[in-house]
């Protein structure tokens, strides 16, 4: 009976994580839009109360995602890893070694130990 209870708890936890991962996948485009929108604000408008409010909402969303176990994948300067990165282009770069991620085109995220979205990257060509 004890084994059945443990197995049931593990299955319930896995089902919860699958549901949470699905929700995170749906929230990531919203985060992307916040980042694009805030990046497009001219420097002379960054102190506008509406813009500072939107920035605070964006940062609060990131804080809550982090607390829930969602973390961005660090990639620039790292060796390309197909488990975490999706290479969408190759670039020349004299400062980085071949096979190194030179640029992040879209941020990737992990939920706990699994990739929710791979980072879309530019890799230094050989």
Language-model regions, residue ranges each:
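Structured alpha/beta interaction-core segments
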Residues: 33-126
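Charge-rich, N-proximal long alpha-helical rod segments
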Residues: 2-35
